Amino acid sequence: NYISILELNNLISGSLVIISVMVLSSLIDLPANLIKIFNIDEKFGFNRMSIKVFILDGVKQLILSILIGLPILLFSLWIIGNLGELWWLWLWVFISFFNFAMLSLYPLYIAPLFNKFEPLSDIKLKAKIEKLLLRCGFKSSGLFVMNGSLRSNHGNAYFTGFGKSKRIVFFDTLLEKLNSKEIEAVLAHELGHFHHEHVKKN
C-alpha cells in the first residue's frame, strides 16, 4: 500500500510540475498573443477575431487539455516510472500511436469544435482540384471549406487527417480572394509537403 501511495504521489507531483510550467508559459505568451491579434493584425487589416471568440478558443483548449492531455501526461509518467531501462522505447511507442490516432481523429472530432467545415460547392473548381490530385497521386476523402474568416483575413489551404479521414481544407477567405489558377498553385505547394512526406517525417 505504501508503494502504491508513493507511486501515486510521484505521478501527481510530476503532473503538477509539468502543468505548472505549461500554465506559466501560457500566461507569459498571453500578452504577446493579444498584441499580435488585436494590435498588429488589426492594424494591417488581418484580424477578424472578437474578444468573445478569443476567450471561447481558450476555454475549449483548456477543456481539451484536461480531457486528453492530462491522461496522456499521467500515463507517460507511469511509463517512465514503471517500465525500467527501456521506458524511453515504450514511451516512444505510446506517443507514436497517440500521434497517429490524433491524425485520424483531429479533422473529424476536434477541428469542428473550433470551425465550421462544409463540402466545396464550386463544381468547376472541384473538378480542377480533383484532376490535380489525380496527377499527384493524392487520395482524399473530401474537399472542404473552413470559415477561417471567423478569426483572420489570411487565406490558406491545407491537408489533414490520416487514412480515411484524410481531407483537403480551404479557408473561405482564400476562395474569396483568388481565382482557380491561383488556388491550384496554393494547393500545389501543400501537395509538395505530401510528395516529400513531411508529415510522416515530422
Regions found by a protein language model. Give the residues of each.
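Polar-ligand-bearing catalytic/cofactor-coordination segments
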Residues: 1-202
